[in-house]
Amino acid sequence: MKRRILITSALPYANGPIHLGHLVEYTQTDIWARYQRLRGHDCVYVCADDAHGTPIMLRAQSEGITPEELITRMHGDHLRDFTGFGIRFDLYHSTHSPENFEISQSIYRALRAADYINVREIEQAYDPVAGIFLPDRFIRGTCPRCGAADQYGDSCEVCGATYSPTDLINPVSAVSGAVPERRNSEHYFFQLGDFSDFLRRWIHSGTLQEEVAHKLDEWFSIGLSDWDISRDAPYFGIPIPDAPGKFFYVWLDALPGYMAATQHWCAAHGRNLADYWGPDSAAEIYHFIGKDIIYFHGLFWPAMLKGSGHRLPTGIFAHGHLTVNGAKMSKSRGTSITARQYLQHLNPEFLRYYIATKLNSHVEDIDLNLEDFLLRGNGDLVGKVVNLASRAAGFIHRSFAGRLAASLGKDQAFYDGLLQTQEAIGEAYAGREYGKAMRDIMALADQINAYVDQNAPWTLAKDPAQHESLHRVVTVTLNGFRVLITLLSPVLPELSRKALEFLQCELDWAGLSKPLLDHQILPYSHLLQRMEKTQVDALIQNPAESPATAPGTAAAPVPTPVPAEAREENPFIGIDDFSKVDLRIARIVAATNVDGADKLLHLTLDIGEGTRSVFAGIKSAYDPASLVGRLTVMVANLAPRKMRFGLSEGMVLAASGPEGGPFLLSPDSGAQPGMRVK
């Protein structure tokens, strides 16, 4: 059945560039939207710049331009970067729009009419030089707990303490440097606590991931406080109706920005806002967000919608944050990489794929390990997928004038087998289990490459008597390539576009059951260039010179390595260190000698969720045939390593010592492939 679906991503703030951390969310959302479109659903994906607030007002002042000029420029920059990464919005709007003014004020009026708004005086910090009330983050001073200087007005980045700006020692305005004054002002509050019973039920209704719902439960233990939804002039934002000099706090008008973008799109496409947001709408609405804003989307937003008579979202999907090389993105380490910096060096499809391999339906941080990124992108996309087309296309054009065979003959069953996991892969996409989908697709790529190796078209091409067999084999190979490209198309839109142009066919998920037969294709041209290490290295910006290497400073002497026997071993590691190693039970499904290698065996390991290719230095102790079917233990999250003989995707565990070895580790009976060793 065709579904009507509205999809949103969180609104990026119009005060800075898009960076790779942002792109986790927009890539996740875009993949999901593309998959829904691929399955024929009526899917609309909207987003917008979050374009109001004090930081935008102050930055515009510092640049000598108006806030409107700043947000117009940032909107263009953001949309350019999103487009560069293949993010396909149906509309990219702004919260500084007529629709958002109207909708935000309408929601407020409905909440006030229902007695969910109260007004009272509060005391605030005021900058007498700049003439503005200061948000907590615009006050700096000495932490009252640890004494660290130059800390924010609400929290210390050194010791993690939270406090009131009035607790800061020697506070100053970050805007003018003046000492803030304490002044009273009348503020408007949304009575969030009135919705406590409703929210307790709603967050466990299946709309949120269960771990998110449990996190939100913590707020009820201390009680839901009234939410301050007003700010005083001067302020760049939406005026509060019938309240001169008062403006909505940025989150009050950012959340309705989803509705405003929908309304703008509807007006251009003959639809009505009520088709999506009306209380009786049958449409599905899904918000993709980061884990840092679940409070606003899981409590404030549903309460605002409920109190103003609108329908609620169908699903809210939170994701984790991005780290680079195992650490938080950092300007000082050069790992705070913007989208624009990336696009200057590398094809965005590699990053889209890598993000997809890491994502699942849970709220887990993902790491961009640049060495793994290089090996996996080249190994999977170029080595396993694109090379299939380049290997087969030459034979088709040299021997068959670019025309595929009229039948798959005896290999029809092999092709049909490739489609057996198609629906499971589709279910993984739908469930946001992208990592599983990528593993299953790469397992298919391994099958097709094994088919090519077994049938050796380069050998068939030398024998005129095998002309028909050659035609069949390369036709099967190119149809297998089409399967891979179709399954990967939500993740790799540009590669799939080029590949389908080469194959002269349309993107058709359901049409894979009918292979391309007696079909003309174009001559092959490069679809995806390999990444070079120098390109990946160029992503890391040079950090500021450290004192040890600054001009005129002597470098510290390099310590002489200590032999392993003389090195004092640390007898302990923490449980956190051990838990980083993902040990899995694996079944050896194939074992072969490696040509040109004296010590290595090539193992294919079943780890439950797919297979891994591993090169192990155990040839001196084991006959390959004796290993097939045996269970062992592998390190499953070791970064892939490019070797002369191929890509090794993990490590099997073995013991050795003066008495001999290596001896493979084996689990007790009952263990199954994929089980984790804890």
Curated annotation (Swiss-Prot):
EC number: 6.1.1.10
Motif ('KMSKS' region): 328-332
UniProt GO MF annotations: ATP binding; metal ion binding; methionine-tRNA ligase activity; tRNA binding
Bound cofactor: record note: Binds 1 zinc ion per subunit.
One Pfam family named in its UniProt record: tRNA-synt_1g
Keywords in alphabetical order: Aminoacyl-tRNA synthetase, ATP-binding, Cytoplasm, Ligase, Metal-binding, Nucleotide-binding, Protein biosynthesis, RNA-binding, tRNA-binding, Zinc
UniProt: ATP binding residues: K331
Motif 'HIGH' region per UniProt: ranges: 12-22
Cofactor(s) named in the record: Zn(2+)
UniProt-listed GO biological process terms: methionyl-tRNA aminoacylation
Protein purpose: Is required not only for elongation of protein synthesis but also for the initiation of all mRNA translation through initiator tRNA(fMet) aminoacylation.
Record protein name field: Methionine--tRNA ligase
Lineage: Bacteria, Pseudomonadati, Pseudomonadota, Acidithiobacillia, Acidithiobacillales
Gene this protein is translated from: metG
